[in-house]
From Swiss-Prot:
SUPFAM superfamilies: Winged helix' DNA-binding domain. Keywords: Cell cycle, Cell division, Chromosome partition, Mitosis, Nucleus. GO terms for biological process: cell division; chromosome segregation; megagametogenesis; mitotic cell cycle; pollen development; sister chromatid cohesion. Belongs to the rad21 family. Low expression in shoots, buds, siliques, leaves and roots. Found in, but not limited to, actively dividing cells: in procambium, protoderm and ground meristem in roots, and in shoot and floral meristems. Residues 167-250, 262-361, 460-511, 545-573 are annotated as: Disordered. GO terms for cellular component: cohesin complex; nucleolus; nucleus. This is Sister chromatid cohesion 1 protein 3. Coiled coil: none annotated. Its main location: nucleus. May be involved in sister chromatid cohesion during mitosis.
Length: 693
């Protein structure tokens, strides 16, 4: 986790900035304006908890977007304010006359009395006037509706063309029932006539007159059966007409049986040729005439009268009321124009659901173009190919690289026998102590170091081996050991000059790190804790090996014969005291070190410490007792920063590791007040009881 949830939460101090860096489309204007940019930048640059560099970069991107949005909002507000100011203060000049700014009252005022009856709507057209918007019946009538045979019950339509051919202008029509006889059909129609009725030569007699106070009668020709060869025309006397037209003898009005057929003379010329005499009698009551609206009789065209054309079949026309009914029936007969029919309203369309808007980042990290280019040319994204080993030697080298920790335990030369291979194994030598050199084979040392003699006198019996004493090898550096030897040694014999260089540097190594350094110099590792006897007759080793007290890690060699410092170049005493050298190399035991526990099996407990850990414990005890006032902590704890001041990274890492070892054993306590701060070391009472001086 490289950031804290408390900082980047939605309601945290940097939550809005984090959202602006990733999902800035979801933020509102109020959220943008509520961010204080200087304070936010300070919180990012100097956070309460350390932030990763990646997190800080994301937050800075969010700050930039918030600042850009604020600039846009400010620019829009300024434009809006500028528009309002321009509208409020108009600077244009108007060059109009004085009275042009006001309209006259007449143009904006309605008249006081609005008489709608005086308006001319132009809709008082006559019924028989020529109208260009109306077609004739023949043009709009279908031809398949014409009957093909003669029917005694003939359907007649009262069309304008038929009326104009057969009826004079000032004639009212009345209807009587058809008197049916065998072989003929008589249709009588009474006309209202004047003082005299004059017969005509034609089969149709037209009589004109005025309306009588009682009734109106029209007389037409008698209609006979066209199938008879001899047709006679009879004149109906006035008395007979009067009796027929009396109120008590008014016949029942005949209703039209079929109005779907058009039987005009123009449609049936054959029927017009066969017909000879037509007699129609029409009567009408005056009361019905007064009650109904007076119809307007269209004028008769003279050309049609002179042409001699007659109606093929003319049934009685009724009263004005029946005429009005025929008007409705004729209107029903005529098919309406499909252009005038109102189209049905379309069904309401269901309202589509609003599509949810999807929010995406404005800029994508990898565009489609970039991905397609990488698929076509992946040279930029490919790394260098690692070749697999193709030979046994390369496989052997690869295996050695995978086992780096074990490579130094194997011989550099191949072809050794099993016994020689076992020599390079640590466990093999440690498991066979009888192969070590016994005490009888080693001669007695010629001289003993004064430092070791003083240690024996002070501490004759000690549960801890000599290697853990402050003056032992663990506590003294090689330079200090050489200094002690040079100070205590007497005059060196002349034959010892040949081995002076060999004696000034130790030939044995206590741990793997020193062995690795020796291998880098070109030497061979020494894995045996007890080296074989040296062949030089001028020095002997003071190894005291016991079968019951076998140490595998810490040992030291002291030459029996000392060397003269004047004969060794670079080893003269320059006047530096041992105390100053110890101050410079106070942590040298971390470089020499020992990783295995030190001590005999009888003296070791379950919490055995390594040589480095014990040396560090002794060092901390000495430093705590010698300089309690120099510590920077008021409680007297030691400061790890002061101890490692000026030391190398490798030495500091080892020091920290050994400190953790002591902490796990419960010998010391570590405390750190803040991250990346100083670490205080507090010595526990167990350190003074378990680790003896």
């Amino acid at each position: 986790m490289f950031y804290s949830h408390t900082l980047l939460a939605r309601k945290g101090p940097l939550g809005t900035v984090w959202c602006a860096a990733h999902v800035h489309q979801r933020l509102k204007k109020s959220q943008y304006t509520s961010i204080n940019i200087p304070d936010t930048v300070d919180n990012i640059m100097f956070p309460e908890v350390p932030l990763a560099l990646r997190t800080s970069s994301h937050l800075l991107v969010g700050v930039v977007r918030i600042y850009s949005k604020k600039v846009d909002y400010l620019y829009n507000d300024w434009n809006l304010l500028n528009t309002w100011v321009a509208k409020a203060f108009v600077s244009t000049q108007v060059n109009l006359p004085e009275d042009a700014r006001q309209a006259p009252p007449e143009s904006v005022t309605l008249p006081q009395a609005l008489n709608l009856d005086e308006f001319d709507l132009e809709d008082d057209t006559l019924d028989m006037e020529f109208d260009n918007h109306t077609r004739s019946e023949e043009d709009i009538t279908l031809t398949d509706q014409i009957p093909t045979g003669i029917d005694p019950y003939v359907a007649v339509t009262f069309d304008e063309d038929i009326i104009s051919e057969s009826i004079p202008m000032d004639v009212d029509q009345s209807t009587e029932p058809v008197s049916r006889h065998t072989g003929e059909i008589d249709v009588e129609t009474a006309h209202e006539t004047g003082p005299d009725n004059e017969p005509r030569d034609s089969n149709i007699a037209f009589d004109t007159g005025t309306y009588s106070p009682r009734n109106v009668t029209e007389e037409f020709t008698e209609v006979q059966d066209p199938r008879q060869s001899n047709l006679t025309e009879e004149r109906i006397p006035n008395s007979e007409r009067n009796d027929a037209t009396s109120p008590g003898t008014v016949p029942e009005i005949e209703r039209m049986r079929d109005a779907a057929h058009d039987l005009s003379p123009t449609s049936h010329p054959s029927f017009a040729a066969q017909q000879q005499d037509v007699r129609v009698e029409r009567t009408e009551s005056l009361d019905e005439t007064l009650n109904e609206k007076e119809p307007t009789i269209p004028s008769i065209d003279e050309e049609m009268l002179n042409s001699g054309r007659h109606s093929a079949f003319e049934l009685r026309s009724g009263s004005p009321g029946s005429a009005a009914g025929s008007e409705e029936e004729r209107a029903d007969f005529v098919h309406p124009s499909p252009q005038l029919v109102l189209q049905p309203s379309p069904p309401p369309q269901p309202q589509r659901r609003a599509r949810k808007r999807k929010n995406f980042d404005g800029v994508t990290v990898l565009t489609n173009k970039n991905i397609s280019e990488r698929l076509k040319d992946p040279s930029d994204t490919l790394r260098k190919r690692k070749k697999m080993p193709s030979s046994k030697l390369k496989f052997w080298r690869m295996n050695n690289q995978s086992r780096k920790d074990q490579n130094f335990n194997e011989p550099l030369f191949t072809g050794f026998s099993d016994d020689l291979r076992n020599v390079f194994e640590k466990d093999y030598v440690a498991s066979k102590p009888h192969l070590a050199v016994s005490d009888e084979t080693l001669p007695e040392p010629a001289s003993v170091s004064p430092t070791r003699e003083a240690e024996v006198e002070i501490n004759p019996v000690s549960p801890i081996p000599d290697s853990t004493n402050p003056d032992s090898t663990v506590q003294l550096s090689p330079a200090q050991q050489t200094e002690d030897v040079l100070d205590s040694a007497g005059p060196r014999p002349a034959h010892a000059e040949s081995v002076a260089t060999e004696a000034q540097s130790p030939r044995t190594f206590d741990n793997d790190d020193m062995g690795i350094e020796h291998l880098r110099d070109g030497g061979f590792p020494v894995y045996m804790p007890s080296p074989p006897p040296r062949s030089s007759p001028f020095r002997t080793d003071d190894f005291t090996t016991q079968s019951g007290n076998w140490e595998t890690e810490s040992y030291r060699t002291e030459p029996s014969t000392s060397t003269v410092p004047e004969d060794l170049p670079g080893q003269r005493n320059l006047g530096l005291s041992p105390v100053s050298e110890r101050t410079d190399e106070e942590l040298y035991f971390l470089e020499v070190g020992g990783n295995s526990p030190v001590g005999t099996p009888a003296s070791q407990d379950s919490a055995a410490l390594t040589g480095r850990a014990r040396a560090l414990a002794q060092y901390l005890k000495q430093r705590s007792s010698s300089s309690p006032t120099t510590s920077s902590h008021p409680s007297g704890d030691l400061s790890l920063s002061e101890i490692l001041a000026g030391k190398t990274r490798k030495l500091a890492a080892r020091m920290f590791f050994e400190t953790l070892v002591l902490k796990s054993r419960g010998l010391i306590d570590m405390q750190q007040d803040r991250p990346y701060g100083d670490i205080a070391l507090k010595l526990m009472p167990a350190l003074f009881s378990k680790v003896q001086t």
